[in-house]
């Protein structure tokens, strides 16, 4: 939005551009466990128990229109879930070179290193790293990682 404002876009044009880009905006969250998602009513209790018992980790993503959180990938252990999740991100980067990627965590040093390795040599704009905000962190808990990516805004001037 800031780049659009600096580009001389009106508020209505900026809103329209952002709404048009939403289908290509992705947010993938990999919590260590589903415990907090269960506590907050975002995941069924049985799913939380089974994933914990079977050492399965899920990557979840919000459905933009409904607001529901959907499981989109699964894997056993950090390496497998990050590899499975990053496959989508890397395919997106192949299709949309120069896209923005941002990585946020609530710890998750191992997962962050795996994501950095996957992104090495890719054509993307690093939109930064940092902590997951407190609202999302409440839902995903400690040692979670979030990967967001979307096409980069192309100025008209």
Language model regions located:
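Mixed-charge interfacial surface used for oligomerization/domain docking
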Residues: 2-157
């Amino acid at each position: 939005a800031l780049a659009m404002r600096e580009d001389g876009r009106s508020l209505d044009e900026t809103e329209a551009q952002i709404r048009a880009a939403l289908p290509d905006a992705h947010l993938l969250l990999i919590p260590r466990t589903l415990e907090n998602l269960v506590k907050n009513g975002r995941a069924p209790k049985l799913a939380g128990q089974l994933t914990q018992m079977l050492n399965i980790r899920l990557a979840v993503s919000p459905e933009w229109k409904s607001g529901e959180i959907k499981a989109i990938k699964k894997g056993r252990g950090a390496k497998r879930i990050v590899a499975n999740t990053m496959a989508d991100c890397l395919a997106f980067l192949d299709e949309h070179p120069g896209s923005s990627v941002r990585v946020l965590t609530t710890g998750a040093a191992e997962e962050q290193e795996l994501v950095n390795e996957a992104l090495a040599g890719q054509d993307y704009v690093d939109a930064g790293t940092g902590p997951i905000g407190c609202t999302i962190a409440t839902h995903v808990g400690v040692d979670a990682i979030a990967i967001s990516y979307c096409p980069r805004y192309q100025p008209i001037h």
